[in-house]
């Protein structure tokens, strides 16, 4: 069963339709995905338009929608001002803030008027993530994960979208965020590796030291996971059992690791795209981890299927 089918079942069995807002109603791709989500009946997908003219002809009126130019935004501006005035925000800035669709969506999430947000088809990542960070808060360090799926195989690649050059401490949190997320997906067995160009001391250098340190920090915090976590490993050692038996004979895992923690954004972003384009894996994500509330950022190249899938994932993230 695919991860999306699994999550559909999980959301439906919860007995409550999560409300996931899509603040880019002027995007035809987003609107097609929203229509499909509405028809599927798994979640409630309200949308935001900036102007009445953006509402498409034949719009499905069963879908709740917000038109910013027609709204009284006073309540939302007051909320943002109270939330951000300690950072120097003035009321006029708060009023401008909530006239932006992405920022208004984050405000609605923060006020519990909706359960989560999916944005990024029309916005750059920095413009979707900034209001979410300002209003939703973080559990620790914000990172992301891609679910890489091919046939019955499911892998988790992190961080391929946000953490540019994480410190050892930050890399340990990236790993923690992803391990917890993979657990929430109901995986029967998790094997996580911290990737490097070195396998257990075969290489030297500052980059290796960082990965070794991150592994140690993670295991000091989670000693109960020692049998599930290893670092530093090269990718072939982590993925191919025959290679691992040669390079790391004391590591007794069977099969491949299924969580791959990349040392920096260069490696992670390149790695997931190679797996996607050359390896034939479907890349689902990036899924944002570490925020206090469910929020996910789309690629601007996202297809209707991508938007639909991220909507389902975000709905699943609302479940406790």
From Swiss-Prot:
Pathway: Metabolic intermediate biosynthesis; acetyl-CoA biosynthesis; acetyl-CoA from acetate: step 2/2. InterPro entries: P_Ac_Bu_trans, P_AcTrfase, P_AcTrfase_dom1, P_AcTrfase_dom2, Phos_Acetyltrans/Butyryltrans, PTA_PTB. Signal peptide: none annotated. Pfam families: PTA_PTB. GO terms for cellular component: cytoplasm. It catalyses: acetyl-CoA + phosphate = acetyl phosphate + CoA. Its EC number is 2.3.1.8. It is found in: Cytoplasm. It is an enzyme of class 2 (transferase). Keywords: Acyltransferase, Cytoplasm, Transferase. Its main location: cytoplasm. One of its GO terms (biological process) is acetyl-CoA biosynthetic process. GO terms for molecular function: phosphate acetyltransferase activity. Belongs to the phosphate acetyltransferase and butyryltransferase family. This is Phosphate acetyltransferase.
């Amino acid at each position: 069963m695919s991860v999306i089918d699994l999550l559909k079942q999980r959301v439906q069995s919860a007995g409550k339709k999560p409300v996931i807002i899509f603040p880019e109603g002027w995007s035809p791709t987003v609107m097609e995905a929203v229509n499909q989500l509405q028809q599927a009946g798994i979640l409630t997908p309200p949308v935001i338009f900036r102007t009445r003219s953006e509402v498409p002809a034949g719009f499905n009126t069963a879908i709740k929608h917000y038109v910013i130019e027609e709204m009284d935004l006073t309540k939302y501006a007051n909320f943002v001002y109270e939330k951000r005035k300690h950072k120097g925000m003035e009321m006029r800035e708060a009023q401008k803030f909530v006239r932006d669709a992405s920022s208004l969506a984050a405000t609605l999430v923060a006020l519990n008027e909706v359960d989560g947000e999916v944005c990024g088809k029309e916005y750059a990542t920095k413009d979707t993530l900034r209001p979410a960070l300002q209003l939703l808060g973080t559990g620790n360090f914000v990172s992301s994960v891609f679910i890489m799926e091919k046939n019955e195989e499911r892998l988790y690649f992190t961080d391929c979208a946000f953490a540019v050059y994480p410190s050892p401490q930050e890399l340990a949190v990236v790993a923690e965020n992803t391990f917890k997320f993979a657990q929430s997906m109901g995986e029967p067995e998790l094997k996580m590796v911290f990737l490097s160009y070195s396998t257990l001391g075969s290489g030297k250098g500052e980059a290796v030291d960082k990965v070794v340190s991150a592994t140690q920090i993670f295991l000091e915090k989670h000693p109960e996971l020692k049998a599930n976590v290893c670092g530093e490993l090269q990718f072939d050692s982590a993925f191919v059992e025959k290679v691992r038996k040669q390079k790391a004979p004391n590591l007794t895992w069977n099969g491949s690791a299924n969580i791959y923690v990349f040392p920096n954004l260069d490696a992670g972003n390149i790695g997931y795209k190679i797996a996607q384009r050359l390896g034939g894996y479907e890349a689902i994500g990036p899924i944002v981890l570490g925020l206090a509330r469910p929020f996910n950022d789309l690629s601007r190249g996202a297809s209707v299927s991508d938007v639909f899938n991220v909507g389902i994932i975000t709905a699943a993230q609302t479940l406790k």
